[in-house]
Regions:
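Active-site-adjacent substrate-recognition loops and nearby beta-strands
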Residues: 1-5, 22-34, 59
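C-terminal intramolecular chaperone/auto-processing assembly modules
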Residues: 3-9, 51-102
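Residues that recognize and position ribonucleotide moieties
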Residues: 34-35, 65
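Active-site-adjacent helical/loop segments in soluble small-molecule enzymes
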Residues: 41
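A short, structured beta-strand/loop element
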Residues: 44-47
Length: 102
């Protein structure tokens, strides 16, 4: 095993609901893209943001935040599972109400 301290993701649906997807253009080349604003993601799920540092001759030249899009997948899967549990409960309630009305 390569991993340790494995913990389930909690509150995934709420976290996903607090993320804001945006469209934007990159400053360097005006290329259009969609995604998230790293600073906003950091407020909701800090583990999804990494700091990219660029150094030259051991001197920090630039530093910026970046969203780790690959890790969002696990959060989305858990959020979908939470949604499905809600859907299943609502379907059961609807069925119970329909059965009771007939």
């Amino acid at each position: 095993k390569l991993k340790k301290n494995i913990q389930p993701l909690e509150g995934a649906l709420e976290k996903v609901q607090n993320l804001r997807g945006v469209s934007f253009e990159w400053k360097k080349d005006d290329k259009k893209s969609i995604g998230f604003i790293a600073q906003e993601v950091q407020e909701v799920v800090p583990d999804l943001v990494k700091v990219n540092r660029k150094e030259h001759d051991g001197v920090l030249v630039s530093e910026h935040l970046a969203v780790d899009y690959g890790n969002i997948t696990a959060l989305l899967v858990e959020a979908m599972k939470e949604q499905q549990q809600i859907i299943n409960k609502l379907e059961a309630r609807i069925k119970a109400l329909e059965t009771g009305e007939k």
